[in-house]
């Protein structure tokens, strides 16, 4: 579809965000840390395994989506953009 639609002014894109810090992510992270360590505050330590040592922000994903929706990204189509600070590359995926 990404190769068929651009001449009609339609771009086909997918954004695949990694671990993004939201209220729900914090709740789940605290629960996982409580289960693993018996201390919900240690969930941030678990993020140290990520390449950036932290989760991404909603704003970081929004910035990428804003760019993709702009005329500056008119040449981008038919792709999935993973936003995860290299987690999938580190994992060999």
Identify what each model region corresponds to.
Residues 7, 20-49, 90-93:
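A glycine/serine/threonine-rich, flexible loop-to-helix segment
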Residues 15, 61-68, 76-78:
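Hydrophobic packing within well-folded, soluble alpha/beta domains
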Residues 36-39, 50-61, 72:
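A conserved structural motif in NAD(P)-dependent oxidoreductases
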Residues 11-17, 21, 69, 82-84:
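Conserved SDR Rossmann-fold cofactor-binding beta-strand/turn motif
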Residues 1-5, 64-65, 69-72:
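Conserved alpha-helical elements of the SDR catalytic core
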Residues 6, 11, 76-78:
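Short, small/polar-rich loop/turn modules that mediate ligand/substrate recognition or access, typified
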Residues 66, 77-93:
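Short C-terminal tail/terminal secondary-structure segment
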């Amino acid at each position: 579809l990404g190769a068929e639609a651009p001449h009609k002014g339609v771009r086909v894109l997918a954004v695949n965000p990694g671990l993004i810090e939201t209220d729900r992510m914090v709740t789940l992270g605290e629960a996982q840390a409580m289960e693993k360590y018996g201390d919900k505050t240690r969930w941030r330590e678990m993020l140290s395994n990520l390449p950036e040592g932290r989760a991404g922000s909603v704003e970081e994903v929004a910035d990428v989506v804003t760019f993709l929706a702009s005329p500056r990204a008119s040449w981008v189509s038919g792709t999935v953009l993973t936003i995860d600070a290299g987690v999938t590359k580190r994992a060999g995926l």
